[in-house]
Amino acid sequence: MAKFAVIGGYTAEAWSKMIDNPGDRVAAVQKVAHAAGGKLEQFFWSFGDDDYLAIIDAPDDISAAAVSIAVGSSGSLRNLRTIRLITPEEGRQVLEKAKAAKAAYSPPGAKAAAGVR
């Protein structure tokens, strides 16, 4: 499974409702992640620009996007972002592919690389 960071904030209305009835936000995130075929690995409250950070394991990008859209459609969140996390091993593989891609790339206005149109 792939890991995703789900980051964002609550609206003023959502904060007001949670103050009146705190509930269990971790259980709510666990439930939505499970419904999309994933699982919640970690959940943190934060302060500053964002109010929470959830680390979710999901089988694929589509499942992670489904979680993000499901919670985003509630109207209780602001500045919701879902970020695909890359392990150090995956990062090494990305850099290896980037090396080959860089050799084939021609920036705008530059002469195209040999054999590439």
Question: Model-derived features: where do they sit?
Answer:
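A compositional/biophysical signature of low hydrophobicity enriched in polar/charged and small residues
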Residues: 1-117
